Structure formats: C-alpha cells, structure tokens
Amino acid sequence: MTTTETPRKVDTGSVRTPAKKQPRSGRRGGLRSAVSATTLLWILAALYGIPVLWFVLSSFKPAGDLFSLPLTLLPHNPTLSGYKEAWDSANFSQYFINTAFVCVITTILTVGASCCTGYALAKYDNKWLKFFFLCILATTMLPSEVMLAPEFLVVRDLGLYNSFGGIILPAVLTATGCFMFRQFFLTVPDELVEAARIDGARELSIFLRIMVPISRPIMLTLAILSFQWRWNDYIWPLLMLNDPEKFTVQIGIQSLVGAQNINWSVLLGGSVISMIPLIAVFLVFQRYVMNADINAGLKD
C-alpha cells in the first residue's frame, strides 16, 4: 500500500520578503545633512565660546600683557594678582551676600506669582483675564528704560528707596514668567482638572497638589532665568541704592573702574568672580529641567 504525500500550501502571508536596501544616494543625503548641521553647531559654539574663553584667560594675564602685540590667547605669565586686588579693593563678600539675598527672595516670589497668574490665565475663562493677559504682553513691547521713571516714583512713595525691598518689589511679576506658565498649563488636559473636581478636590488643592508638581520643569527654568536676571541687574539697583553697605555685585564691579584710567586686569578678575555663582547655579539645576509626564493621572 503506497501513500502519496500532498504538497503543503505555502502561506504567502508568513513569508518575509527581503527588505529593500536603501539607495546609497538617500543615505549620503542624510549623512550630508547631519554633517552640515553638526558643522553649523560647532561654528555657533565657537562664535559664542571663543570670546568667553578669551575673557577668562585674559583675567590671568598681567595688566601689561593685555594689549601687547601680538595678541595671544594663552597667558605667558599667568597670575592671580587681578583676582586678589579686585577682592581686596572692593567689599565683594558683602556684595555677594546682598546680591544673593535679593536674587533668592526675588526668584521665589517671581516663580510663585508667575505660577498663580499663569494658571488663572490658562484654566479660567473670563474676558477680563484675557484683557489682563494682553496688558501683560503689552509691557514687553516697551523699552525697560521707559518704565524706570514711573517705577522709581512708585517705589519712592512707598518708602522703599535705598532698601532691598525697592529692588525686589518691581521685579516680582514678569511677563516672561506669566507667559511661560500660561503656555504650559494650556497643554495640561482639562480632563485632569475635571477629574479632580469630581473627586471633591477644591481649587486650591488642585493647584497645589496637581498643577504645581507637574509644572516643576517650568518652575526650575524660570528660577534659573530669574536668578540670572537679578544677579546681572545693574541699572535698577544703581538708581535705588546709595548706601555702599547695600550695593550689589554689579555696582561693586563698576566701582573698580577708575575716574581717569581702568585697570583691566582687576576689572576682568572681578567680572570672572561675579560669574562663579551663576555657573554653579546652572550646573546644579540644569539636570532637573526636563519634560514632565502630564498624562500620568488620566485614564484611557
């Protein structure tokens, strides 16, 4: 008895077709675009980095070598005399304490006020809030010098002249901070807020327990920017303060400039000293600036 084997049907759906090779021209085009983008980034980094590098290295040069020809990037006889003389000639320790106090208090108030304002502008539907937001944006179209005179008169009438409060109060609410928080809260789904309201949460609880934690990246970003703005602020503290014991770092650097001549080695040393806290703050907090998963509390 013989058996005949019937041929099996080939499942055409399970047969994998060999992947088509990408044309070399397409791969070359992608490589060229990547190389060109990388080259452009390196050029931009050099344009920004070389002046800063020259500035820092020049602070280690003696005063006589700064303008000697030919100009060189690296100091031939590196010295710390500029740093020492800058620290001794100006009361930098007191300036650092004053500036740090102003920056920390202003940053905390700026982040808190901007977060509350941005949440109200994003999640409450009111025509007056929209008009208020337009007024906030309109302030960005005015030069800062235009606002100096009215701000000075208001602060003087409040009795805050020659005080840290006079520096802190006008800098609390910023249009940039309100805009950043508003745009972030607009990306938060309204279902997240409605779900919390259905569960019986109050508005203050929704804001503090839900909105504030998920807005941490924006809070840290604004905190870094606000700290930088206040640390580098020069014009407003110069108008507000006349007591040398209350001067900030930037006014202290200006005091290093003589009436007849400028000791550039001392000025560069003081400027580099003033940069150290900003660099430290940025290096510490930059890793916390990341995107948050705002959809974690939503159900499909």
Residue map of PLM features:
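Small/flexible residues
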Residues: 10-11, 18, 26-30, 63, ...
